[in-house]
Amino acid sequence: MCDHDGVERRTNGGGTASGAAHVARVRRSQTSSGATPSSTKVPAPASRTPAGATRSDRARAASAPGPWLRGPGRHLSAWTVLLLTGLTALAFVLPGGARGVIAVVALACLGLASGWSALARSRVSRIDASIIALAGVATAAVVGTTGEMSWAPALMGVSVVALVTVEIFTAPTPHDHSRPDGTAPGAPPPQWLRAGSFPTMAVAVTAVPIAVGGASWAALAWNPGWSATTLLACAVTAVVVIGDQIGRTFRTQSLAALVVGVVAGLVVASVVAWAGSAGQLVPTVLPALAGIVGESAALVLHGVLTGIAVSLAVIAVDALFGEHRRPTSRSGAIARGCAKFLVSAVPVYMMMRIGGA
């Protein structure tokens, strides 16, 4: 006879007597050593999560890829943004600056694609990652060469179609569990042999606009008249990411990034206006606004708006992928930094076009 744990019970008399004798011997040995059954404790296994962790914290810890970055390593995404913005500013001031900016954007797209699976915590095949990287690199190269941002939607659409096509042809054939007449009572519906095709497709497609958005850096660098805006965007992006490290909650980090971004944009624009360069920069930056509020005021307002726009772009990345201080892998942290760098130039380019530049 077996109990619910699958342990066989011995019901004959001999088995019962021998079992009772064994229990008596164990009790005598515990009494002689000064231990009682209630005082004997089995050490609990070490927990993989902190003692005060909630259920959601334990779930995130279990699903997070390793190795985890802790301590100073958790700021790797911020260091990635600082490196990319520094390289962009350096490439822009050197001869052939547009080509250098394209190379920096291509590097960021490669970092995004290689770590996208760890950042999104979803399966992304090598083919999908290659398409994501190729979409960003190709768009930056075309826009940086022609100066036409109108190529971006077309290349993004082609990339999305390519991702969907790859996912369709690599997905397994569904199992049909129904009978030929289709009247089987209680028959389960057709199911995929491998679940997650649609979530994987959605995750891969989400990376395409981020990679393609990096072409905004190439568009800013292509126009020589937008040099002040390009350097302003680099400086504000770097300062905003530093401010985004302040605090321990998403709300505090977002507020710090917004305040620091506004202050940085205001300070940089005020310095340019105080140096007397507003008359040379405003006609190519915000000509429509300059005709209404004046050149110096237009430049200062442009700096403030740049700080707000870049801050919101960085906050959006953190809102999409969770707090940047959460445990993550090295590739995921680098991909997060690349994503922040790529999207930070999109609102700046939009302001230039809306302002009449």
Task: Locate the predicted segments by residue.
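N-terminal signal-anchor module of multipass membrane proteins
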Residues: 2-15, 19-113, 348-352
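C-terminal ends of transmembrane helices
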Residues: 62-65, 109-123, 162-196, 239-255, ...
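C-terminal transmembrane helix-loop-helix hairpin of multi-pass membrane proteins
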Residues: 71-73, 77-78, 251-357
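Central hydrophobic cores of alpha-helical transmembrane segments in multi-pass inner-membrane proteins
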Residues: 84-85, 104-115, 135-139, 158-167
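Structural signature of hydrophobic alpha-helical transmembrane segments
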Residues: 91-108, 148-161, 221-238, 296-312
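Cytoplasmic-side transmembrane-helix entry/capping segments in multi-pass membrane proteins
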Residues: 123-134, 151-157, 179, 191-207, ...
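Hydrophobic alpha-helical segments and helix pairs
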Residues: 151-227
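Internal active-site segments that recognize and position negatively charged phosphoryl groups
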Residues: 194-276
